[in-house]
Regions:
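Catalytic core of membrane glycerolipid acyltransferases/transacylases, capturing the structured
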Residues: 43-105, 162, 171
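Acidic/glycine-enriched edge-of-secondary-structure segments
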Residues: 18-30, 94-106
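Surface-exposed charge patches
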Residues: 31, 68, 92, 116, ...
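Non-catalytic C-terminal accessory region of glycerolipid acyltransferases
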Residues: 2-20, 24, 35, 107-201
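Short Gly/charged-rich anion-binding patches and loops
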Residues: 27-28, 65, 89, 142-143
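Residues at alpha-helix termini
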Residues: 34-35, 72, 96, 150
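Helix-to-loop junction immediately C-terminal to a conserved catalytic motif
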Residues: 21-57
Length: 201
């Protein structure tokens, strides 16, 4: 019997971007991915600041896969999500996972909050879904581009690819300053991937 390839490992994360989670948390992430039949490909770049975007976002399962990936990578990442999902009783768990509740009616406040995070510590990784919804989005929101400028960092494009059951840590994208151009270029990159519900992307 051959040695089974790990689904994900903290060696895929630079030391300075690793969280202080214990071995049990990393085991949980690996186990969830293994049970579901998924694996993580690629390396987190060795940079001080990163804005991570994840797509295609077509299913509630995306959240489970994302959290398992973060735990398995032992990645110290803060991720932005609608404040409405931070329900009483689970807020502590969501925040332990790195969640930051955001009110999308106040985009400037979000940018300022993220910029403050970037000024702290030895490195920061912020995650966001550019589509903003699981439903088919004809036009992506540009907030993540503003966040990248506020952080003064490149965008790491991470993809869910259902046909191969792979989480792909993909290319770095450096925003040009032209939001329309950047959205087209980034969406074209994601055209090669297929979400769990392909008709929603």
């Amino acid at each position: 019997m051959g040695i089974k390839t790990p689904t994900v490992h903290q060696d895929q994360t630079p030391v300075h971007l690793r969280a202080n989670r214990g071995a049990v948390s990393r085991w949980l992430g690996r186990t969830v991915l293994s049970i579901l039949g998924w694996r993580v490909e690629g390396q987190i770049p060795d940079l001080k600041r990163l804005l991570v975007i994840g797509a295609p976002h077509t299913s509630n399962w995306d959240f489970v896969l994302a959290m398992a990936t973060i735990l398995g990578l032992n990645l110290r990442m803060r991720w932005l999500a609608k404040h409405t999902i931070f329900k009483r009783g689970v807020v502590w768990f969501m925040e332990w996972l790195g969640g930051i509740p955001t009110d999308r009616t106040q985009p400037q406040a979000i940018v300022e909050s993220v910029a403050r995070l970037a000024r702290k510590g030895k490195g920061v990784v912020i995650g966001i879904t550019p589509e903003g919804t699981r439903k088919k989005a004809l036009k992506w929101k540009t907030g993540f581009l503003r966040l990248a400028r506020a952080l003064d960092c490149p965008i790491l494009m991470v993809a869910i690819n259902f046909p191969t059951k792979t989480i792909v840590i993909g290319d770095l994208y450096h925003p040009s300053g032209d939001n329309n151009y950047d959205l087209v270029a980034i969406k074209q990159y994601y055209d090669q991937f297929q979400g769990i519900h392909k008709d929603q992307f």
